[in-house]
Amino acid sequence: MNIRGLVLLFVLMTSIFLSGCSNDVAKRPDLKSDYEFEAVINYGDKAFNICCVKESEQWKFTYKSPAQLIDMEVILENENYKISYNGLIQEGLRSEMPDSNICDFVARSLEYITRGKGIEFHKKDDIIIGNGVFDGGDLKVTYDKNRLPKEIIIGKDIEIKFNSFKKV
């Protein structure tokens, strides 16, 4: 998986978690509350573990592949960012990131998706399902009866399953 693919997964995971919805059928977790989660990302024949924890006023996302080929940490705090990717560190103000910067890609994608546009929601029994398109692939998000995310599927290659999702 290339870095853009990894960042897309990061963007999707965080944006699905943080985004608001465009109608009343599916209400997401309240952003005034704090949630943490652990999940497994299956991308083709590769698997990655992801963990999101809230520390003070910042969100900290960590990614590790089982073979330790990828070790990535992203910290978003107010208007600041810090990314550590396999030991390389980059940080600064999100507003001052150059357009070609991968961090800017993360920030712009988060901003776009968190508006809740482009995803349609419907309820089936006690489960809420969101359908849309993300980066050219079909997107399906499944929430449990408590409106917490359980599974995300993008196209035919990417599947994200949450092991835990809890309020802190």
For each of these PLM feature ranges, what is it?
Residues K27-L31, Y35-A39, I83-G137:
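Flexible, processing/modification-adjacent segments and terminal tails
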Residues C52-R108, Y112, I158-E159:
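An acidic-aromatic
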